[in-house]
């Protein structure tokens, strides 16, 4: 490969609705990086890595943890469940991965506490009980934790260093959230789940149980708590290459996604700066990860969605060959044709420098492929995804049809070795979206990657 440029930083973002295969590519690119940074989301994200045939699922810790010697950072834009963090750390340590000496956690991270997940589940249940469509959250407490952050009442990692301050803030927070949870209980739309039972007494989340667990976590977290903003800026000055790892995808961004069917954070590349504490001038290359087809978990509009549960259909082929089940929830992913008009929107809001196309091998064996190049919306032809779920739901895709291929692309590592029709499909995606293809993934394995332009070597 081309030699990496010293002091170069790359942002990796999903360009669809998440699940694009970012984890593998972050792991692959970390060969050229000295630090990997998570800058938004929480343990609702799910990244799967396959290294030497061994599968590892990560939800909170940056994917670079699988590369020995690489430092990993959890930035201020992440909402942190200490309980889930230590579950993940212990799982990695059992597999022989050194974590604690390499992981740095921003003291400004808001904490996810046990009642946040209960609020998340209660609200989804209330929507369903009231006849509304569910948002499709993971039920992990991400949204309620971000709400507390924006309302300026969140408990943050730095509060764990001050037990009296933490206790006072926790009491205020519990008074508010217990009141809300009681209203859901009385409505009959919600019951406390088993995970919350250890924290309950007389139908309320108890201060002592939450506080004592938090103080146990505080002792374990102390060696990893850091001024992540300062450390990242110092690392850059020293010539380190940094990789900023996005979670979820652009169409789940709270501002730019299919609102309200979105997550609670900004998933776009610009948030790599705000969510980690570096200036935007330090973001040198933005790599957009996109599947060779589209998938979505949960509710919300999906213009190119296919019948994916019926055997013998292209959608069923994508679902089964692509093993389209959520890493975090296990829910089946909805499947559909590639949407280049959607990708135009993602390219616009992220400022994409290059694309990485993943899961190309899943399309092997399909006789023909359809590529969405625009939509009919209320009698008008448009060539970019509109803003707003209601408008997107009314979009009728305009397709181009391309020939498929029968030869296997699994494990191909040279572009010229791909079937001619596969190359034409990729070239048409680049033409319609006006974004060059930098990388292509031809299986989940780390080494099954075609490199066109290395993000750390591009001028």
UniProtKB/Swiss-Prot annotation:
Enzyme Commission no: 6.3.4.4
Positions annotated as active site in the UniProt record: 19, 47
Subcellular localization: Cytoplasm
UniProt GO cellular component terms: cytoplasm
Pathway recorded for this protein: Purine metabolism; AMP biosynthesis via de novo pathway; AMP from IMP: step 1/2
Named cofactor requirement(s): Mg(2+)
Gene Ontology molecular functions: adenylosuccinate synthase activity; GTP binding; magnesium ion binding
Reaction catalysed by this enzyme: IMP + L-aspartate + GTP = N(6)-(1,2-dicarboxyethyl)-AMP + GDP + phosphate + 2 H(+)
Annotated residues for binding of IMP: 19-22, 44-47, 138, 152, 248, 263, 331
Gene3D superfamilies cross-referenced by the UniProt entry: Adenylosuccinate Synthetase, subunit A, domain 1 (3.40.440.10), Adenylosuccinate Synthetase, subunit A, domain 2 (1.10.300.10), Adenylosuccinate Synthetase, subunit A, domain 3 (3.90.170.10)
Binding of substrate, residues: 327-333
Subunit structure: Homodimer.
PANTHER family attached to this UniProt entry: ADENYLOSUCCINATE SYNTHETASE
Name used for this protein in its record: Adenylosuccinate synthetase
Gene encoding the protein: purA
